[in-house]
Structure formats: C-alpha cells, structure tokens
Amino acid sequence: LGTRFANRLEQSTYDFGIYDTDISNGSTVFVDVEDSSSLEAIKDCSVIVNLAAVHRDDIKPISRYDDVNVNGAINVCNIARKYGIKKIIFTSSVAVYGFAKADTDENGDHNYFNDYGRTKHLAELIYKEWHDEDPDDRMLVIVRPTVIFGEGNRGNVFNLLSQIAKHRFIMFGKGNNKKSMAYVENVAAFLVFACSFDNGYHVYN
C-alpha cells in the first residue's frame, strides 16, 4: 500500500516525504514510530499519513502489537502536538469490529477478537483524543480497510486465486461464504484524496 500511495503522490501536486524503517529506497528517511526521537524528522510535515503497523499471525512477543500500533500512535500524536501538525490520516482495520454482522457501517460496535484488532482499536482512541483536543482546527481521517489485494501481493488472496487457477482449490461446504476485499490502488487513491479533507473527524470502512 505504501508504495502505491507514494506513486500516486508523485502524480499529484503534493510535496511529500517517505519515512520508514526500511531505507532501501534512497529517498526514504529512517523513522520508527516506536522511537519518538526519530519522529523529529517529520516536524515540517503538514499532513501525517501513518501506515505503520504490526500484522502477522506469528508475531512474538505479542507485546510487539502494542509497541508499534499503540505506542506508535502515542508518539505520532505527541510529535503532531509538539510541532502543530494539524492533519493525521491513520490506516486502522476492520479487525476492530471482530466477527461483525453483515452491512456493519462505521458506527458498528468494536468487538475485536485478537491483539491486532485490540491494538488498532486502542490506536484509534489515541488519535481521537488528539483530535478532540482542538476539533475545530484539526483533521483526523481513520480508514478501516479490509483485506487489501493487488499486483505484486503474495498474501492469502494471491494464494487463493492461484489455487483456483491451477484447479487445486478444494471447497468445503456450499461455497456461500463472502469475503470483503479492497483493491490496493483504490485504497491508495482514497488516501491521496483524504489529504485534502477539511478539519473534522472522518471514519471510513
């Protein structure tokens, strides 16, 4: 998602920087949301788009979820306060809803069932607290994507489609299960669009 987002920003009128723990790209500046001192690098930004997260089923120790997703949110908000950055876009997850009912909208109850959903929920609360300190002069956009798929991805969606294409897919039951998915370019395009939002609190599934 980050790469697609950056590619779309390059085609826009925005000046932007890429901040990451992976600095293999020569234009990337090292920033770790767990390290508040490294976040000083973003002090001149007018919009923060936080895509950083820990999301794997085999994360050890479990506290890594809290370190990145929760403490990272605290650090991002603190740097925004320190330098008067008034716009934050945060990619959360539909995992905050847990096993939600069909047609659950942005006002649905949070019934997370794992540490990923729990820490995304807590991060949302931290960002909301930051916004509510000065709601008339701050913008917060929370995006809750479902499974993101697209070219170059080798995750579960790719594996599923690959098995179907090779006629190796084994279906259990009647095959009536439905899965929500989001195309990576659509999510990236929305993030660019969200950079132009007015002050306020905006949440999107």
Segments from the language model and where they lie:
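N-terminal Rossmann/SDR dinucleotide-binding element
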Residues: 1-47, 51
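NAD(P)H-binding glycine-rich loop region in Rossmannoid oxidoreductase-like domains
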Residues: 33-71, 75, 79, 96-99
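Glycine-rich NAD(P)-binding loop of the Rossmann-fold in SDR/ketoreductase-type enzymes
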Residues: 64-75, 110, 114, 118-119, ...
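Conserved Rossmann-fold NAD(P)-dependent oxidoreductase catalytic core, especially the SDR/UDP-sugar
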Residues: 75-115, 133-138
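Conserved beta-loop-beta element that borders a ligand/cofactor-binding pocket
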Residues: 125-151
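Substrate-positioning beta->alpha
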Residues: 153-159, 173-196, 202
